[in-house]
């Protein structure tokens, strides 16, 4: 291994160790000694890469921002229904948050006040959601009377709330939780002709793979429609209430 390779590995180890500390303790209570110890390096090695705690936090946030922007980019740049891409992006981000402590810590840091913050990740998420909903409106995918402005407020409140709740219980990020949210929202958001084709569990390679319409190759199984099924008690009534908020 070359000296440059070792330096890269050390820096990445420090970023991950810092993310673990920031996630568990927050920016103020995290300390550099614990970060260097967690990475298995000396304090001197840490200061070779980062001048101070704010610089370490900035590196964690930078890595998290890159991962989140990549996820958002998949939604913006992919083909197909804009509403389905919005669903897919939320599932992709949830998987990132479940799997990557750096992404979780980066979002927490971005919500805290500390010196050197240069980005607003929640604003970027808002713009992603608003952009996809505006595209959905332009393509005639939204139900009559549903506006991107009011819809984005509901989606943002729900997804941001899930992220905050998941800091204490990552079960909030599990696919069933997010799928239930979309089972509730999609019948209120989507034009009637599209509802059956949208998959609230996401349409990516790790998603359910079963469209809500229930059409499966070979007719072996049928997916339940959005807002129905034994695992979604009371959803039609709840969906009606949410629909009023969206209009």
Where are the model-predicted features located?
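Basic, helix-initiating cap at the start of DNA-binding domains
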Residues: 1-25, 32-38, 54-58, 77
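N-terminal intrinsically disordered/low-complexity leader segments
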Residues: 1-9, 168, 196-247
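Hydrophobic alpha-helical connector segments
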Residues: 59, 70-99, 114, 148, ...
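Short, basic, alpha-helical segments at the C-terminal edge of helix-turn-helix-like DNA-binding modules
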Residues: 62-68
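Short amphipathic helical patch at the helix-1/turn junction of helix-turn-helix
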Residues: 26-27, 47
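DNA major-groove recognition helix of helix-turn-helix
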Residues: 50, 60-61
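Short hydrophobic/aromatic patch on the recognition helix
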Residues: 39-50
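Hydrophobic/aromatic-rich alpha-helical bundle segments in the mid-to-C-terminal region
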Residues: 104-111, 115, 119, 126, ...
């Amino acid at each position: 291994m070359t000296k440059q390779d070792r330096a890269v590995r050390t820096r990445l180890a420090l970023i991950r160790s810092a993310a673990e500390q920031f996630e568990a303790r927050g920016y103020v209570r995290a300390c550099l000694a614990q970060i260097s110890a967690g990475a298995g390096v000396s304090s001197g090695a840490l200061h070779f890469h980062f001048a101070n705690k704010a610089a370490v936090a900035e590196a964690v946030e930078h890595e998290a921002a890159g991962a989140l922007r990549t996820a958002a980019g998949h939604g913006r740049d992919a083909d197909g229904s804009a509403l389905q891409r919005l669903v897919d992006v939320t599932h992709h981000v949830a998987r990132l948050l479940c799997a990557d402590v750096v992404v979780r810590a980066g979002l927490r840091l971005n919500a805290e006040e500390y010196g050197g913050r240069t980005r607003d990740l929640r604003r970027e998420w808002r713009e992603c959601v608003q952009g996809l909903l505006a595209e959905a409106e332009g393509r005639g995918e939204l139900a009559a009377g549903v506006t991107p402005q009011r819809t984005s407020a509901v989606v943002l409140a729900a997804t941001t709330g899930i992220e905050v709740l998941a800091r204490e219980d990552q079960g909030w990020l599990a696919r069933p939780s997010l799928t239930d949210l979309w089972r509730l929202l999609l019948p209120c958001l989507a034009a009637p002709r599209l509802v059956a084709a949208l998959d609230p569990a996401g349409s990516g390679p790790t998603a359910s793979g079963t469209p809500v319409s229930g059409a499966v190759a070979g007719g072996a199984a049928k997916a339940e429609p959005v807002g129905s099924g034994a695992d979604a008690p009371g959803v039609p009534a709840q969906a009606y209430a949410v629909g009023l908020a969206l209009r």
